[in-house]
Swiss-Prot record:
One of its GO terms (molecular function) is ferrochelatase activity. It comes from Staphylococcus epidermidis (strain ATCC 35984 / DSM 28319 / BCRC 17069 / CCUG 31568 / BM 3577 / RP62A). It comes from the Bacteria. Involved in coproporphyrin-dependent heme b biosynthesis. Catalyzes the insertion of ferrous iron into coproporphyrin III to form Fe-coproporphyrin III. PANTHER family: FERROCHELATASE, FERROCHELATASE, MITOCHONDRIAL. GO terms for cellular component: cytoplasm. This is Coproporphyrin III ferrochelatase. Pathway: Porphyrin-containing compound metabolism; protoheme biosynthesis. Pfam families: Ferrochelatase. Gene3D superfamilies: 3.40.50.1400. Fe-coproporphyrin III binds at Y12, R29, R45, Y46, S53, Y124. Fe(2+) binds at H181, E263. The gene is cpfC.
Amino acid sequence: MTKTIGLLVMAYGTPYKESDIEPYYTDIRRGKKPTEEELQDLKDRYEFIGGLSPLAGTTDRQAEALLEALNKEQDDVNFKLYLGLKHISPYIEEAVEQMHNDGIKEAVTVVLAPHYSSFSVGSYDQRAQEKADEYGIQLTHIKHYYQQPKFIKYWTEKINETLEQIPNQEHDETVLVVSAHSLPKGLIERNNDPYPHELHETAEILKQESNIIHVAEGWQSEGNTGTPWLGPDVQDLTRDLYKEHQFKHFIYTPVGFVCEHLEVLYDNDYECKVVCDDIGVNYYRPEMPNTHPLFIGAIVDEIQSHI
């Protein structure tokens, strides 16, 4: 008899329409409403990238692709999909409640973020676990999947494809900037958090597996909290790398993200490109994983190793 297991896919969430922006931003700021200036700045960023971020639709497609791929691999288990978001409905708690209403007793959770941090993935897991405990639902949490061969293969192929656009004799004048979302430095240090090490390990593996010669690690999209965040910031890093090594070509791989959204389309494709244009170097940013079979397969492989 086929056993039904919940598949709780969790993500940050994004506004679906303009009227969602203020409550969404307020939720991110833990109930503190943004000023008109802050709200307008966010609206301007969305407008700059062509309207509201495509993240919502992409997240849905990623979750559906993951469900389909998992169920193809399993004969004795049928996964049922639930989507839980951090900052907008359907919230994580709503998804777990729906599982309970559907009679789900066991579920696997996975966050659409390849590296583990107690601040990010850990907080999603905690919210899901606290709600699941109310209903006696058993959860298996997937912590990370950056180390999965298919995840590495995806980025290796994209890096090598990008290098093909650059003359061979200029490969030594090319640098790969591997980045993820910055997080508060104090919190990372207090928790002895593995997050920076996992990004470093990703960069090292990509250097080993791809044809790139030079690799640098950076952080991006830090919050405005008045406290130190992980650095160097990718924009500062770009200027420093140019100053020290005179690289001509900069390839940005924001491997901590899994699709094209505001942090990639604005923070990389606009802000980093502005820096590249200013110092007179070439900007490249390979396509994000989105629903690519290698990316989906990496998560499937990680889940299968835990069930």
